[in-house]
Protein backbone atom coordinates (compact mmCIF):
# COMPACT_ATOMS: atom_id res chain seq x y z
CA UNK A 1 0.00 0.00 0.00
CA UNK A 2 1.44 3.38 -1.05
CA UNK A 3 1.57 5.80 1.93
CA UNK A 4 -0.61 8.91 1.56
CA UNK A 5 1.05 11.96 0.04
CA UNK A 6 0.29 15.18 1.96
CA UNK A 7 0.33 18.06 -0.52
CA UNK A 8 -0.96 20.55 2.02
CA UNK A 9 2.50 21.93 2.67
CA UNK A 10 3.18 22.64 -1.01
CA UNK A 11 2.55 26.41 -1.00
CA UNK A 12 4.46 29.48 -2.08
CA UNK A 13 7.16 30.73 0.23
CA UNK A 14 5.28 34.03 0.67
CA UNK A 15 2.27 32.31 2.17
CA UNK A 16 4.13 29.67 4.16
CA UNK A 17 3.61 31.48 7.48
CA UNK A 18 -0.11 31.97 6.90
CA UNK A 19 -0.57 28.34 5.92
CA UNK A 20 1.24 27.06 8.95
CA UNK A 21 -1.50 28.54 11.12
CA UNK A 22 -4.19 26.49 9.40
CA UNK A 23 -5.71 23.70 11.45
CA UNK A 24 -4.30 20.47 10.11
CA UNK A 25 -6.63 18.24 11.92
CA UNK A 26 -9.32 18.84 9.34
CA UNK A 27 -7.16 17.72 6.45
CA UNK A 28 -7.91 14.05 5.74
CA UNK A 29 -6.96 14.10 2.07
CA UNK A 30 -4.85 11.50 0.27
CA UNK A 31 -4.54 13.39 -3.02
CA UNK A 32 -6.16 16.54 -4.30
CA UNK A 33 -5.79 16.89 -8.07
CA UNK A 34 -6.26 20.28 -9.70
CA UNK A 35 -9.62 21.24 -11.11
CA UNK A 36 -8.28 21.22 -14.64
CA UNK A 37 -8.03 17.86 -16.46
CA UNK A 38 -4.51 16.45 -15.98
CA UNK A 39 -2.46 15.22 -18.93
CA UNK A 40 -1.80 11.74 -17.61
CA UNK A 41 -4.94 11.29 -15.54
CA UNK A 42 -5.12 10.90 -11.79
CA UNK A 43 -5.88 7.43 -10.54
CA UNK A 44 -7.18 7.20 -6.98
CA UNK A 45 -6.97 3.96 -5.00
CA UNK A 46 -10.74 3.70 -4.95
CA UNK A 47 -11.28 4.80 -8.56
CA UNK A 48 -12.97 2.35 -10.97
CA UNK A 49 -13.71 3.08 -14.66
CA UNK A 50 -17.13 1.44 -14.49
CA UNK A 51 -18.48 3.38 -11.47
CA UNK A 52 -18.51 7.12 -12.17
CA UNK A 53 -21.10 7.84 -9.49
CA UNK A 54 -18.98 6.19 -6.80
CA UNK A 55 -15.98 8.20 -7.97
CA UNK A 56 -17.77 11.51 -7.44
CA UNK A 57 -18.78 10.49 -3.91
CA UNK A 58 -15.23 9.54 -3.01
CA UNK A 59 -13.85 12.82 -4.41
CA UNK A 60 -16.32 14.80 -2.32
CA UNK A 61 -15.24 12.90 0.80
CA UNK A 62 -11.53 13.56 0.36
CA UNK A 63 -11.67 17.27 -0.53
CA UNK A 64 -10.45 19.30 2.49
CA UNK A 65 -12.73 22.01 3.76
CA UNK A 66 -10.24 24.87 4.17
CA UNK A 67 -7.53 24.10 1.53
CA UNK A 68 -6.43 27.34 -0.14
CA UNK A 69 -6.53 27.55 -3.94
CA UNK A 70 -3.17 27.13 -5.72
CA UNK A 71 -1.43 30.30 -6.75
CA UNK A 72 -0.53 31.24 -10.31
CA UNK A 73 3.12 30.34 -9.82
CA UNK A 74 2.24 26.81 -8.70
CA UNK A 75 -0.20 26.37 -11.59
CA UNK A 76 2.53 27.35 -14.06
CA UNK A 77 4.97 24.81 -12.60
CA UNK A 78 2.34 22.11 -12.77
CA UNK A 79 1.47 22.85 -16.40
CA UNK A 80 5.17 22.66 -17.37
CA UNK A 81 5.55 19.36 -15.54
CA UNK A 82 2.42 17.93 -17.18
CA UNK A 83 3.51 18.97 -20.68
CA UNK A 84 6.98 17.43 -20.18
CA UNK A 85 5.49 14.15 -18.98
CA UNK A 86 3.05 14.09 -21.88
CA UNK A 87 5.79 14.66 -24.49
CA UNK A 88 8.04 12.05 -22.88
CA UNK A 89 5.27 9.48 -22.87
CA UNK A 90 4.55 10.12 -26.56
CA UNK A 91 8.24 9.62 -27.43
CA UNK A 92 8.34 6.37 -25.42
CA UNK A 93 5.28 5.01 -27.24
CA UNK A 94 6.77 6.00 -30.60
CA UNK A 95 10.10 4.25 -29.90
CA UNK A 96 8.41 1.08 -28.67
CA UNK A 97 6.28 0.83 -31.82
CA UNK A 98 9.22 1.46 -34.17
CA UNK A 99 11.38 -1.37 -32.77
CA UNK A 100 9.08 -4.26 -33.77
CA UNK A 101 8.64 -2.75 -37.24
CA UNK A 102 12.38 -2.53 -37.77
CA UNK A 103 12.86 -6.10 -36.57
CA UNK A 104 10.13 -7.46 -38.83
CA UNK A 105 11.55 -6.16 -42.12
CA UNK A 106 12.33 -9.11 -44.43
CA UNK A 107 15.99 -9.74 -45.09
CA UNK A 108 15.66 -11.77 -48.26
CA UNK A 109 14.14 -10.77 -51.59
CA UNK A 110 11.01 -11.95 -53.39
CA UNK A 111 11.85 -15.65 -53.19
CA UNK A 112 12.43 -15.55 -49.43
CA UNK A 113 9.40 -13.47 -48.50
CA UNK A 114 7.48 -13.68 -45.27
CA UNK A 115 10.43 -14.45 -42.98
CA UNK A 116 11.70 -11.74 -40.64
CA UNK A 117 15.19 -11.59 -39.23
CA UNK A 118 14.02 -12.82 -35.84
CA UNK A 119 12.11 -15.68 -37.47
CA UNK A 120 15.15 -16.73 -39.51
CA UNK A 121 17.35 -16.70 -36.45
CA UNK A 122 14.75 -18.75 -34.61
CA UNK A 123 14.64 -21.33 -37.41
CA UNK A 124 18.43 -21.56 -37.38
CA UNK A 125 18.46 -22.14 -33.63
CA UNK A 126 15.79 -24.83 -33.94
CA UNK A 127 17.74 -26.55 -36.72
CA UNK A 128 20.89 -26.51 -34.59
CA UNK A 129 19.00 -28.39 -31.88
CA UNK A 130 19.47 -31.50 -34.02
CA UNK A 131 23.22 -31.25 -33.47
CA UNK A 132 22.58 -32.08 -29.82
CA UNK A 133 22.42 -35.75 -30.81
CA UNK A 134 26.12 -35.57 -31.70
CA UNK A 135 27.05 -35.37 -28.01
CA UNK A 136 24.47 -37.92 -26.93
CA UNK A 137 25.93 -41.11 -25.42
CA UNK A 138 24.98 -44.16 -27.43
CA UNK A 139 25.61 -47.79 -26.55
CA UNK A 140 28.73 -49.06 -28.29
CA UNK A 141 27.60 -52.64 -27.88
CA UNK A 142 24.31 -51.89 -29.60
CA UNK A 143 26.11 -50.16 -32.47
CA UNK A 144 28.56 -53.05 -32.89
CA UNK A 145 25.80 -55.65 -32.83
CA UNK A 146 23.72 -53.81 -35.42
CA UNK A 147 26.71 -53.14 -37.67
CA UNK A 148 27.71 -56.81 -37.61
CA UNK A 149 24.23 -57.87 -38.69
CA UNK A 150 24.22 -55.22 -41.39
CA UNK A 151 27.66 -56.27 -42.65
CA UNK A 152 26.51 -59.87 -43.05
CA UNK A 153 23.43 -58.73 -45.00
CA UNK A 154 25.53 -56.52 -47.29
CA UNK A 155 28.01 -59.30 -48.04
CA UNK A 156 25.17 -61.67 -48.84
CA UNK A 157 23.68 -59.09 -51.19
CA UNK A 158 26.99 -58.55 -53.00
CA UNK A 159 27.51 -62.29 -53.38
CA UNK A 160 24.06 -62.65 -54.95
CA UNK A 161 24.79 -59.88 -57.46
CA UNK A 162 28.23 -61.30 -58.33
CA UNK A 163 26.77 -64.75 -58.97
CA UNK A 164 24.09 -63.30 -61.24
CA UNK A 165 26.70 -61.33 -63.18
CA UNK A 166 28.82 -64.44 -63.75
CA UNK A 167 25.78 -66.42 -64.89
CA UNK A 168 24.75 -63.72 -67.37
CA UNK A 169 28.15 -63.54 -69.05
CA UNK A 170 29.17 -67.20 -68.94
CA UNK A 171 25.90 -68.86 -69.91
CA UNK A 172 25.79 -67.32 -73.36
CA UNK A 173 26.96 -69.84 -75.92
CA UNK A 174 29.77 -68.85 -78.28
CA UNK A 175 27.82 -70.16 -81.27
CA UNK A 176 25.13 -67.52 -80.68
CA UNK A 177 27.57 -64.64 -80.33
CA UNK A 178 26.64 -61.76 -82.71
CA UNK A 179 30.28 -61.60 -83.82
CA UNK A 180 29.83 -64.93 -85.64
CA UNK A 181 27.32 -63.31 -88.01
CA UNK A 182 29.77 -60.53 -88.80
CA UNK A 183 32.32 -63.08 -90.02
CA UNK A 184 29.70 -64.75 -92.23
CA UNK A 185 28.72 -61.44 -93.80
CA UNK A 186 32.36 -60.72 -94.66
CA UNK A 187 32.68 -64.10 -96.35
CA UNK A 188 29.47 -63.55 -98.29
CA UNK A 189 30.59 -60.18 -99.57
CA UNK A 190 33.76 -61.74 -100.96
CA UNK A 191 31.80 -64.53 -102.73
CA UNK A 192 28.89 -62.56 -104.20
CA UNK A 193 29.71 -60.24 -107.14
CA UNK A 194 28.95 -56.57 -106.54
CA UNK A 195 26.46 -56.30 -109.47
CA UNK A 196 24.52 -59.44 -108.63
CA UNK A 197 21.43 -59.60 -106.49
CA UNK A 198 21.49 -60.48 -102.76
CA UNK A 199 22.45 -64.08 -102.14
CA UNK A 200 19.66 -66.48 -101.18
CA UNK A 201 19.10 -67.56 -97.62
CA UNK A 202 20.80 -70.93 -98.08
CA UNK A 203 24.03 -69.18 -99.05
CA UNK A 204 23.85 -66.80 -96.08
CA UNK A 205 23.51 -69.58 -93.53
CA UNK A 206 26.51 -70.15 -91.33
CA UNK A 207 27.96 -73.65 -91.40
CA UNK A 208 29.72 -75.34 -88.53
CA UNK A 209 33.22 -75.07 -89.98
CA UNK A 210 32.71 -71.30 -90.38
CA UNK A 211 31.96 -70.88 -86.68
CA UNK A 212 34.75 -69.71 -84.40
CA UNK A 213 35.55 -71.63 -81.26
CA UNK A 214 36.04 -68.34 -79.40
CA UNK A 215 35.12 -64.80 -80.35
CA UNK A 216 36.68 -61.57 -79.15
CA UNK A 217 33.78 -60.92 -76.81
CA UNK A 218 33.75 -64.44 -75.38
CA UNK A 219 34.51 -64.45 -71.68
CA UNK A 220 35.93 -67.02 -69.36
CA UNK A 221 35.67 -67.28 -65.61
CA UNK A 222 39.31 -66.21 -65.36
CA UNK A 223 38.57 -63.00 -67.29
CA UNK A 224 35.60 -62.13 -65.12
CA UNK A 225 37.53 -62.81 -61.93
CA UNK A 226 39.94 -59.95 -62.65
CA UNK A 227 37.48 -57.32 -61.52
CA UNK A 228 36.93 -54.53 -59.01
CA UNK A 229 33.55 -54.45 -57.30
CA UNK A 230 32.04 -51.11 -56.26
CA UNK A 231 28.79 -49.70 -54.87
CA UNK A 232 27.11 -46.80 -56.62
CA UNK A 233 24.18 -44.43 -56.55
CA UNK A 234 22.47 -42.24 -59.12
CA UNK A 235 23.00 -38.49 -58.74
CA UNK A 236 19.42 -37.31 -58.93
CA UNK A 237 16.91 -35.27 -56.92
CA UNK A 238 14.35 -37.96 -57.72
CA UNK A 239 14.18 -39.96 -54.51
CA UNK A 240 13.23 -43.22 -56.18
CA UNK A 241 16.25 -43.09 -58.49
CA UNK A 242 18.65 -41.77 -55.86
CA UNK A 243 17.84 -44.65 -53.49
CA UNK A 244 18.40 -47.45 -56.02
CA UNK A 245 20.90 -50.01 -54.74
CA UNK A 246 23.55 -50.37 -57.46
CA UNK A 247 26.56 -52.67 -57.56
CA UNK A 248 29.07 -52.38 -60.39
CA UNK A 249 32.10 -54.26 -61.73
CA UNK A 250 35.15 -52.93 -63.56
CA UNK A 251 37.04 -55.60 -65.53
CA UNK A 252 40.78 -55.13 -65.90
CA UNK A 253 41.30 -57.46 -68.90
CA UNK A 254 39.42 -55.22 -71.37
CA UNK A 255 38.75 -52.01 -69.32
CA UNK A 256 35.00 -52.59 -69.50
CA UNK A 257 32.39 -52.19 -66.78
CA UNK A 258 28.82 -53.13 -65.95
CA UNK A 259 26.33 -52.14 -63.23
CA UNK A 260 23.51 -54.19 -61.70
CA UNK A 261 20.55 -53.11 -59.58
CA UNK A 262 19.58 -55.08 -56.49
CA UNK A 263 15.85 -54.96 -55.82
CA UNK A 264 14.00 -56.26 -52.82
CA UNK A 265 10.28 -57.05 -52.90
CA UNK A 266 8.98 -57.49 -49.39
CA UNK A 267 11.18 -59.36 -46.91
CA UNK A 268 12.09 -62.53 -48.80
CA UNK A 269 11.88 -61.88 -52.54
CA UNK A 270 14.85 -60.28 -54.27
CA UNK A 271 15.83 -59.64 -57.86
CA UNK A 272 19.08 -58.69 -59.61
CA UNK A 273 18.65 -56.83 -62.91
CA UNK A 274 21.19 -55.30 -65.31
CA UNK A 275 21.27 -51.52 -65.03
CA UNK A 276 24.19 -50.65 -67.34
CA UNK A 277 25.20 -53.29 -69.86
CA UNK A 278 28.78 -54.54 -70.03
CA UNK A 279 30.77 -52.48 -72.50
CA UNK A 280 33.75 -50.19 -72.89
CA UNK A 281 32.70 -46.65 -71.99
CA UNK A 282 34.20 -43.18 -72.29
CA UNK A 283 34.00 -39.96 -70.28
CA UNK A 284 31.06 -37.85 -71.44
CA UNK A 285 32.11 -34.56 -69.79
CA UNK A 286 34.99 -32.91 -68.02
CA UNK A 287 38.62 -32.51 -69.04
CA UNK A 288 38.84 -36.18 -70.05
CA UNK A 289 35.77 -36.11 -72.26
CA UNK A 290 36.01 -38.77 -74.97
CA UNK A 291 38.73 -40.78 -73.22
CA UNK A 292 38.16 -44.38 -72.21
CA UNK A 293 37.55 -45.28 -68.58
CA UNK A 294 40.61 -46.78 -66.93
CA UNK A 295 41.34 -48.43 -63.62
CA UNK A 296 42.51 -45.10 -62.19
CA UNK A 297 39.06 -43.60 -62.79
CA UNK A 298 37.43 -46.02 -60.36
CA UNK A 299 37.68 -44.84 -56.74
CA UNK A 300 35.38 -43.83 -53.89
CA UNK A 301 33.77 -40.50 -54.73
CA UNK A 302 34.37 -40.73 -58.48
CA UNK A 303 31.53 -39.77 -60.84
CA UNK A 304 30.95 -41.91 -63.93
CA UNK A 305 28.91 -40.45 -66.79
CA UNK A 306 26.95 -42.38 -69.42
CA UNK A 307 24.64 -41.46 -72.29
CA UNK A 308 21.18 -42.52 -71.18
CA UNK A 309 20.11 -43.24 -74.76
CA UNK A 310 22.65 -46.09 -74.96
CA UNK A 311 21.13 -47.99 -72.03
CA UNK A 312 17.85 -49.76 -72.87
CA UNK A 313 17.22 -50.99 -69.32
CA UNK A 314 17.13 -47.56 -67.66
CA UNK A 315 13.82 -46.32 -66.18
CA UNK A 316 11.96 -43.48 -67.88
CA UNK A 317 12.74 -40.97 -65.15
CA UNK A 318 16.47 -41.35 -65.82
CA UNK A 319 16.11 -41.39 -69.61
CA UNK A 320 14.54 -37.94 -69.44
CA UNK A 321 18.06 -36.57 -68.92
CA UNK A 322 20.73 -36.86 -71.58
CA UNK A 323 23.42 -37.83 -69.08
CA UNK A 324 23.35 -40.45 -66.37
CA UNK A 325 25.69 -39.60 -63.48
CA UNK A 326 26.75 -42.46 -61.25
CA UNK A 327 28.65 -41.81 -58.01
CA UNK A 328 30.90 -44.54 -56.59
CA UNK A 329 30.11 -44.75 -52.87
CA UNK A 330 32.30 -47.68 -51.84
CA UNK A 331 34.89 -49.92 -53.49
CA UNK A 332 36.78 -53.14 -52.84
CA UNK A 333 40.09 -51.49 -51.99
CA UNK A 334 42.00 -54.78 -51.67
CA UNK A 335 41.09 -55.87 -55.22
CA UNK A 336 41.80 -52.37 -56.55
CA UNK A 337 45.31 -52.27 -55.07
CA UNK A 338 46.01 -55.78 -56.36
CA UNK A 339 45.03 -54.91 -59.93
CA UNK A 340 46.97 -51.64 -59.83
CA UNK A 341 50.08 -53.47 -58.73
CA UNK A 342 49.64 -56.07 -61.48
CA UNK A 343 49.06 -53.58 -64.28
CA UNK A 344 51.75 -50.91 -64.25
CA UNK A 345 49.79 -48.01 -65.68
CA UNK A 346 51.64 -45.06 -67.20
CA UNK A 347 50.55 -41.47 -67.67
CA UNK A 348 47.90 -41.59 -64.96
CA UNK A 349 49.29 -38.62 -63.03
CA UNK A 350 49.42 -36.42 -66.14
CA UNK A 351 45.79 -37.25 -66.91
CA UNK A 352 44.58 -36.52 -63.41
CA UNK A 353 46.62 -33.35 -62.75
CA UNK A 354 44.26 -30.91 -64.59
CA UNK A 355 41.32 -32.28 -62.64
CA UNK A 356 43.31 -31.97 -59.42
CA UNK A 357 43.89 -28.28 -60.20
CA UNK A 358 40.16 -27.80 -60.72
CA UNK A 359 39.48 -29.42 -57.36
CA UNK A 360 41.85 -26.99 -55.65
CA UNK A 361 40.00 -24.01 -57.16
CA UNK A 362 36.63 -25.40 -56.10
CA UNK A 363 37.93 -26.24 -52.62
CA UNK A 364 39.05 -22.63 -52.06
CA UNK A 365 35.58 -21.31 -52.97
CA UNK A 366 33.89 -23.95 -50.82
CA UNK A 367 35.98 -23.02 -47.77
CA UNK A 368 34.93 -19.36 -48.06
CA UNK A 369 31.25 -20.22 -48.35
CA UNK A 370 31.30 -22.76 -45.53
CA UNK A 371 32.27 -19.97 -43.12
CA UNK A 372 29.09 -18.13 -44.14
CA UNK A 373 26.99 -21.30 -43.88
CA UNK A 374 28.33 -22.52 -40.54
CA UNK A 375 25.27 -21.58 -38.44
CA UNK A 376 22.56 -21.37 -41.12
CA UNK A 377 23.49 -24.08 -43.61
CA UNK A 378 20.29 -26.13 -43.26
CA UNK A 379 18.02 -23.18 -44.00
CA UNK A 380 20.06 -21.78 -46.90
CA UNK A 381 20.70 -25.07 -48.72
CA UNK A 382 17.07 -26.15 -48.51
CA UNK A 383 15.99 -22.66 -49.52
CA UNK A 384 18.30 -22.73 -52.54
CA UNK A 385 16.89 -26.07 -53.63
CA UNK A 386 13.38 -24.64 -53.51
CA UNK A 387 14.54 -21.47 -55.30
CA UNK A 388 16.15 -23.40 -58.17
CA UNK A 389 13.15 -25.68 -58.45
CA UNK A 390 10.93 -22.63 -58.95
CA UNK A 391 13.19 -21.32 -61.74
CA UNK A 392 13.32 -24.69 -63.52
CA UNK A 393 10.27 -24.22 -65.76
CA UNK A 394 11.25 -26.99 -68.21
CA UNK A 395 11.85 -29.54 -65.47
CA UNK A 396 15.25 -30.70 -66.78
CA UNK A 397 17.28 -29.12 -63.97
CA UNK A 398 19.26 -26.81 -66.29
CA UNK A 399 19.64 -23.10 -65.48
CA UNK A 400 21.63 -20.23 -66.96
CA UNK A 401 24.55 -18.29 -65.51
CA UNK A 402 22.46 -15.25 -64.57
CA UNK A 403 20.08 -17.44 -62.55
CA UNK A 404 22.91 -18.71 -60.36
CA UNK A 405 24.37 -15.24 -59.85
CA UNK A 406 20.98 -13.91 -58.77
CA UNK A 407 20.53 -16.85 -56.40
CA UNK A 408 23.77 -16.03 -54.59
CA UNK A 409 22.67 -12.40 -54.18
CA UNK A 410 19.21 -13.43 -52.99
CA UNK A 411 20.63 -15.57 -50.20
CA UNK A 412 23.41 -13.07 -49.36
CA UNK A 413 26.27 -15.41 -50.26
CA UNK A 414 29.40 -13.46 -51.19
CA UNK A 415 31.48 -14.83 -54.07
CA UNK A 416 33.89 -12.54 -55.89
CA UNK A 417 33.39 -12.06 -59.61
CA UNK A 418 36.81 -13.57 -60.38
CA UNK A 419 36.08 -16.68 -58.32
CA UNK A 420 32.68 -17.10 -59.93
CA UNK A 421 34.12 -16.86 -63.46
CA UNK A 422 36.76 -19.49 -62.67
CA UNK A 423 34.11 -21.66 -61.09
CA UNK A 424 31.77 -21.27 -64.08
CA UNK A 425 34.47 -22.28 -66.60
CA UNK A 426 35.17 -25.45 -64.63
CA UNK A 427 31.49 -26.25 -64.25
CA UNK A 428 30.78 -25.75 -67.96
CA UNK A 429 33.45 -28.30 -68.79
CA UNK A 430 31.69 -30.87 -66.62
CA UNK A 431 28.28 -30.16 -68.11
CA UNK A 432 26.62 -31.54 -71.20
CA UNK A 433 25.00 -28.27 -72.30
CA UNK A 434 26.95 -25.25 -73.53
CA UNK A 435 25.20 -22.32 -71.83
CA UNK A 436 23.31 -24.08 -69.04
CA UNK A 437 24.35 -26.11 -66.00
CA UNK A 438 22.43 -28.56 -63.86
CA UNK A 439 21.63 -26.83 -60.56
CA UNK A 440 22.37 -30.00 -58.64
CA UNK A 441 25.92 -30.00 -60.03
CA UNK A 442 26.14 -26.29 -59.21
CA UNK A 443 25.31 -26.87 -55.54
CA UNK A 444 27.66 -29.84 -55.24
CA UNK A 445 30.52 -27.91 -56.83
CA UNK A 446 30.20 -24.54 -55.08
CA UNK A 447 29.23 -25.74 -51.59
CA UNK A 448 30.82 -29.17 -51.62
CA UNK A 449 29.01 -32.16 -50.20
CA UNK A 450 29.24 -34.55 -47.30
CA UNK A 451 31.35 -37.65 -47.78
CA UNK A 452 29.79 -40.91 -48.91
CA UNK A 453 29.89 -42.39 -45.41
CA UNK A 454 27.60 -39.65 -44.12
CA UNK A 455 25.48 -39.73 -47.27
CA UNK A 456 24.84 -43.45 -46.84
CA UNK A 457 23.12 -42.82 -43.50
CA UNK A 458 20.99 -40.05 -45.02
CA UNK A 459 19.81 -42.51 -47.67
CA UNK A 460 19.16 -45.18 -45.04
CA UNK A 461 17.03 -42.79 -43.01
CA UNK A 462 14.98 -41.75 -46.04
CA UNK A 463 14.55 -45.32 -47.30
CA UNK A 464 13.29 -46.27 -43.85
CA UNK A 465 10.62 -43.56 -44.16
CA UNK A 466 9.77 -44.19 -47.82
CA UNK A 467 7.66 -47.32 -47.38
CA UNK A 468 6.24 -47.26 -50.93
CA UNK A 469 9.55 -46.32 -52.63
CA UNK A 470 8.06 -43.26 -54.33
CA UNK A 471 10.81 -40.80 -53.41
CA UNK A 472 8.37 -38.67 -51.38
CA UNK A 473 7.59 -38.95 -47.66
CA UNK A 474 4.56 -37.47 -45.91
CA UNK A 475 5.00 -35.25 -42.85
CA UNK A 476 2.66 -37.57 -40.94
CA UNK A 477 5.02 -40.52 -41.47
CA UNK A 478 8.00 -38.39 -40.42
CA UNK A 479 6.23 -37.41 -37.20
CA UNK A 480 5.43 -41.07 -36.47
CA UNK A 481 8.97 -42.32 -37.05
CA UNK A 482 10.96 -39.48 -35.46
CA UNK A 483 11.99 -40.29 -31.87
CA UNK A 484 13.35 -37.59 -29.54
CA UNK A 485 13.57 -39.65 -26.33
CA UNK A 486 17.38 -39.73 -26.35
CA UNK A 487 17.93 -36.04 -27.09
CA UNK A 488 20.17 -34.53 -24.36
CA UNK A 489 17.69 -31.73 -23.62
CA UNK A 490 14.90 -34.26 -23.16
CA UNK A 491 17.05 -36.41 -20.86
CA UNK A 492 18.05 -33.38 -18.76
CA UNK A 493 14.43 -32.18 -18.57
CA UNK A 494 15.01 -28.81 -20.29
CA UNK A 495 12.72 -29.75 -23.20
CA UNK A 496 9.99 -32.25 -23.93
CA UNK A 497 9.93 -34.80 -26.74
CA UNK A 498 7.15 -32.87 -28.47
CA UNK A 499 9.17 -29.64 -28.41
CA UNK A 500 12.20 -31.26 -30.06
CA UNK A 501 10.02 -33.03 -32.62
CA UNK A 502 8.04 -29.87 -33.41
CA UNK A 503 11.22 -27.82 -33.87
CA UNK A 504 12.57 -30.42 -36.32
CA UNK A 505 9.33 -30.52 -38.34
CA UNK A 506 9.07 -26.73 -38.37
CA UNK A 507 12.55 -26.24 -39.82
CA UNK A 508 12.05 -29.06 -42.32
CA UNK A 509 8.60 -27.98 -43.53
CA UNK A 510 9.52 -24.30 -43.64
CA UNK A 511 11.73 -24.78 -46.69
CA UNK A 512 9.80 -27.50 -48.56
CA UNK A 513 7.78 -26.79 -51.69
CA UNK A 514 4.75 -28.59 -50.19
CA UNK A 515 3.71 -28.32 -46.57
CA UNK A 516 2.46 -31.90 -46.21
CA UNK A 517 5.28 -33.87 -47.88
CA UNK A 518 9.07 -33.92 -48.16
CA UNK A 519 11.02 -35.04 -51.21
CA UNK A 520 14.37 -36.82 -51.10
CA UNK A 521 16.17 -33.75 -52.45
CA UNK A 522 14.77 -31.55 -49.67
CA UNK A 523 15.57 -34.17 -47.04
CA UNK A 524 19.13 -34.46 -48.33
CA UNK A 525 19.61 -30.67 -48.49
CA UNK A 526 18.49 -30.34 -44.87
CA UNK A 527 21.12 -32.76 -43.58
CA UNK A 528 23.68 -31.41 -46.05
CA UNK A 529 23.35 -28.06 -44.29
CA UNK A 530 23.61 -29.63 -40.83
CA UNK A 531 26.70 -31.54 -41.93
CA UNK A 532 28.64 -28.30 -42.47
CA UNK A 533 28.65 -27.53 -38.76
CA UNK A 534 29.61 -31.05 -37.60
CA UNK A 535 33.29 -31.97 -37.83
CA UNK A 536 33.32 -35.64 -36.86
CA UNK A 537 31.73 -38.33 -39.01
CA UNK A 538 30.52 -40.34 -36.02
CA UNK A 539 28.98 -37.23 -34.46
CA UNK A 540 27.02 -36.61 -37.65
CA UNK A 541 26.00 -40.25 -37.87
CA UNK A 542 24.56 -39.98 -34.34
CA UNK A 543 22.35 -37.11 -35.55
CA UNK A 544 20.76 -39.61 -37.94
CA UNK A 545 21.15 -42.87 -36.06
CA UNK A 546 19.52 -41.85 -32.76
CA UNK A 547 16.26 -40.13 -33.82
CA UNK A 548 15.62 -42.45 -36.79
CA UNK A 549 16.79 -45.58 -34.92
CA UNK A 550 18.98 -46.77 -37.79
From Swiss-Prot:
Ca(2+) binds at residues 466, 468, 470, 477. Gene3D superfamilies: EF-hand. Residues 1-20, 175-198 are annotated as: Disordered. Residues 379-414, 415-452, 453-488 form the EF-hand domain. The keyword Transmembrane does not apply. Residues 181-190 have a biased composition (Polar residues). Keywords: Calcium, Metal-binding, Repeat. This is Calcyphosin-2. Coiled coil: none annotated. GO terms for molecular function: calcium ion binding. The gene is Caps2.
Amino acid sequence: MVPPLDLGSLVDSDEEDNFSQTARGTVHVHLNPPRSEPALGWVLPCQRPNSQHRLQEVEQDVIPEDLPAPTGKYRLKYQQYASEMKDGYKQYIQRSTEKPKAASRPEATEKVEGASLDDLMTLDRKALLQQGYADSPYGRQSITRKSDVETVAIEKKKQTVAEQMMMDHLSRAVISDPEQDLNTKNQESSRVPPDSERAPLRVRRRTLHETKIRTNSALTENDLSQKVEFDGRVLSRNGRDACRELIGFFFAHDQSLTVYEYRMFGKNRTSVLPFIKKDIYHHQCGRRKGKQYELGDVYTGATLTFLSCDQPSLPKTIKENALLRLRITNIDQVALNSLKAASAEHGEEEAVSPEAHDQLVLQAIQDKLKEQLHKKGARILTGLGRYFQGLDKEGNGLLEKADFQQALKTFHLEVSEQDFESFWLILQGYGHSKNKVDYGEFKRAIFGEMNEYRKSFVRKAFMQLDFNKTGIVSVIDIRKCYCAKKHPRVISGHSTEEEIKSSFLETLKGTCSKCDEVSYGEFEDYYEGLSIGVAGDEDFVNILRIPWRI
